[in-house]
Curated annotation (Swiss-Prot):
It catalyses: N(7)-methyl-GTP + H2O = N(7)-methyl-GMP + diphosphate + H(+). It comes from the Bacteria. Its EC number is 3.6.1.-. This is 7-methyl-GTP pyrophosphatase. SUPFAM superfamilies: ITPase-like. Its main location: cytoplasm. One of its GO terms (biological process) is nucleotide metabolic process. The active site is at D69. One of its GO terms (molecular function) is nucleoside triphosphate diphosphatase activity. It comes from Salmonella typhimurium (strain LT2 / SGSC1412 / ATCC 700720). The record marks W12, Q70, E154 as: Important for substrate specificity. Its cofactor is a divalent metal cation. It is found in: Cytoplasm.
Length: 194
């Protein structure tokens, strides 16, 4: 049975995969994440998830390698990590009363057989109308400077929302576990029987 590799150093993705109680290792992929000119959000996350998984194939030649990438889209534009408090406040003000869509690309690459499975999972976050004071308080308390969209749904960010829509709530944090379990089963690796 091939061993499992998570092509990520994200503590959030690691924590999500740990929910499945299956043994795995993490390794940092070496991938240029720059979008290509005219690349649509779905294409971008799919390409990057695949590239992350396949970038580790030489190091891990008999493994199942999981790659994942996520972007946040508001009004048709990719919204990145804010990096500053001012930018975080601007992003949250723009999201207020609107729908933010997260696209998470998932790839499972069998480095022994060369078999690749991919999927893109969308997840919609409906923001409630936020006051300037609420935005300021949230940014001060949660400090979401390294989170796409300027919020952490697994923390206080849940108080910003009116509704969440998607097949798998884990998708919003960065790793669609329902889709991953389906892919693993197609490779003969059932998380319930490990």
């Amino acid at each position: 049975m091939p061993r499992l590799i998570l092509a990520s150093t994200s503590p959030w993705r690691r924590a999500l995969l740990e929910k499945l109680t299956i043994p795995f290792e993490c390794a940092a992929p070496d991938v240029d994440e720059t979008p290509m000119p005219g690349e649509a959000p779905r294409q971008l996350v799919l390409r990057l998830a695949q590239a992350k998984a396949q970038s580790l194939a030489a190091r891990f030649p008999n493994h199942l390698i999981i790659g994942s990438d996520q972007i946040c889209v508001l009004d048709g534009e990719i919204t990145g990590k804010p990096l500053t408090e001012e930018k975080a406040r601007q992003q949250l003000a723009k999201a207020s009363g609107n729908i933010v869509t997260f696209y998470t690309g998932l790839a499972l690459y069998n480095s022994a057989s060369g078999h690749l499975q991919t999927e893109v999972e969308p997840f919609d976050v409906h923001f409630r109308h936020l006051s300037e004071a609420e935005i300021d308080d949230y940014v001060r308390k949660e400090h979401p400077l390294h989170c796409a969209g300027s919020f952490k749904s697994e923390g206080l960010g849940i108080a910003l929302f009116e509704r969440l829509e998607g097949r798998d709530p884990n998708t919003l944090i960065g790793l669609p576990l329902i889709a991953l379990c389906q892919m693993l089963r197609r490779e003969g690796f059932n998380p319930l029987q490990q």
